[in-house]
Amino acid sequence: MAAKIVITGASGRLGRVVGEGLAAGARSLLLTDIADPPQPLPRGAEFRRIDLTDKAAMLALAPETAAVVHFGALPAERSFEEILGPNVIGTYHAFELARLAGARMIFASSNHVIGFHERGTLLDEDSVMRPDGFYGLSKCYGELMGRLYWDKHGVESLSIRIGSARPEPRDVRQLRTWISHDDLVRLVEAGLAAEGLGCRVAWGISGNTRRWWRDNGAESLGYKPQDDAERYADALDPAEPGSGPVALRYQGGGFCAEGYSRDEPSPADIFAWMKDR
């Protein structure tokens, strides 16, 4: 049985991007999702309908798994109960699959693991986690699971803290957080090819002029982004419309504001922050 790269969440927005990109490099792919298969199916790829929370179905893939590219998740803020199944239990099953297969894991983490850091703060991969919601919290869990599985079982993993993966940035925040689809595929490819990967974290961003994050982890993999959000800057509204003071204060933007119940920062604090922008 030929070993394949298993992509979870392969029918999702970014799962399709990564599947198409890896297929273009003549990779042998096994695509999985609870949803219908992506159309058209990438050339040479096989699809199986699998629920991430079905442990037996996930682990049954081990004999034919060369690597796991785990993009399956609820991709937005939801209640804890909704997040728990796909994002927490499902991620555990994906790491168990990698362990049983003796395969490496590429984990789709998120910038929302650090969302409550203030804007203007330059972060690196070792900056403290400050998730901005249950979605971000679930990605913290996935990154820490990568650490556990490396230390305890020797499972290599790359956690990619994906910024804003879109065809082009949609607002001025994304001038800092954007990663093009092509660069996302390049970063996944770098993680699959790297020798001595161990357990690493990398920021999933393009070569943006206005970046908030120092991407030493990705550079050490040989990742060379080809795109920069700055080319879109003149077309974007500099006011970041629709964002209140909480969203504008923190790197996570609107995720920080959703469900926020503390007293909002005082006007003095807001003005101090604006002065330092």
Residue ranges of each PLM-predicted region?
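N-terminal Rossmann NAD(P)H-binding glycine-rich loop of SDR-like oxidoreductase domains
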Residues: I5-A24
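Conserved Rossmann-fold NAD(P)-dependent oxidoreductase catalytic core, especially the SDR/UDP-sugar
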Residues: H93-R130
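Catalytic helix-loop patch of NAD(P)-dependent Rossmann-fold dehydrogenases
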Residues: G85, E118-S157
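Glycine-rich NAD(P)-binding loop of the Rossmann-fold in SDR/ketoreductase-type enzymes
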Residues: T53, E82-H93, M129, L137-C140, ...
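NAD(P)H-binding glycine-rich loop region in Rossmannoid oxidoreductase-like domains
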Residues: I50-P86
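Alpha-helical substrate-binding/gating segment
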Residues: R161-E168, W178-C199, G207
